[in-house]
Amino acid sequence: MNISLFLAFTTAILLGSGAIRPLEKPEVFRYPEKTSTANGKISYINNIAVLEVKGTPEQMGEAIGKLAVKAAPKAAKYPRDVLNHFGVEFLWIFFAKAGQRMTAFFPQAYLDELNAISKFSGVSKEELVVGNTLFDLKKIVACSGIAIEPSQSTTRGMLMGRNLDYPSLGYMNQYTLVTVYKPEKKKAFAAIGFPGLIGSLSGMNQDGLCLAIHEVIDIKPGLRKFNYDGVPYAMCYRQILEECATVEEAFELLKKLPRTSTTNLLIADRKRSAVFEVTPDQVLERKSKEGVVVCCNHFCSAEIKPFFPINVRRSFQRFSILEELRIPDSKISMASVMEYLDTVNLGNDTLQTMVFEPATLKLHLSYESTPSSKGPFNTLELAPLFQK
């Protein structure tokens, strides 16, 4: 099947299918506590599941496989469940074949990690590959984010908040996992995600560089929307956390990486913030205005913005609401950021809400119920976890 037609077909179905199945009754899941391997351990800190791993890709993959993925078999079935939820489970074989083709462009370290996860968890490589490429091959992530720079923050430090909006199916939020990676010869970083996810949808590193991905559906006619010969976007953004300390460094690295699809990346360091508007062929920086930058699910830059953009799950309205926090001569509190993220929540599909404080390396995370923006928020001190 032609990849462009396949992507258009699946996107149309997943955004507007009338075959959406009822959500499961919410459940409570907890990872086995205080378990460890030679290169990893899992524990709960302030009611947040934290997996710490270190070493080579194979060693980290072994720890992830044994401690997290093996302990959460239902989470490994999520890609199949989400297709079933939308009534398109028959497309699994297409996603599996497309994902397998994309593995040729995985960074070798990430492929080694994935293979080790499969070996030590018992989850098939096919399921892990689909779980790590489905984001690029379809578009159903609809997120909202905002960064408040130190000049506008009551904390006098950067605040970056985001809602991760993705079908929870009544259970996936319960599998939220903060994985603290301490790879050899790279920066330590925390990825807020799920077991078996190699890349980073949301994260912060030891230097306080933090980021959050927001998918974009459409692009100006004539521009390329998908690149089969690219690195899945979540893996690109993990590379940024492993190698970069500032927004400027991240911009330069991202321009060099082969990119698969269209995304907005909300990014901040301790001094400034921006949104990178990303396509397979371009990376454009949208700078903050008056100390604030907002990010949703559409492009704003004239070079790539469609003439008639799709208003994905009220992306325009969510954007406008968050823009209200750009208040000259006023300081914005963390409580206000959380309040506005709650205002733009997408109900049961808002499965993680978080605020990063780069200056203090703190993460404030809510995930226990949906919409997660309602709280409660628990705080995780990342600085001691980053120590090697």
Model-derived segments and spans:
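C-terminal, well-structured catalytic/ligand-binding subdomain of enzymes
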Residues: 21-120, 150-388
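Bacterial N-terminal signal peptides that target proteins for export
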Residues: 1-6
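Surface-exposed patches in mature extracellular/periplasmic domains of secreted proteins
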Residues: 102, 125-133, 265
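Charged, often glycine-rich, active-site loop that binds/positions anionic groups
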Residues: 136-148
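Acidic helix-start/capping segments at beta-turn-to-alpha-helix junctions
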Residues: 91, 131-136
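Bacterial N-terminal signal peptides
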Residues: 7-14
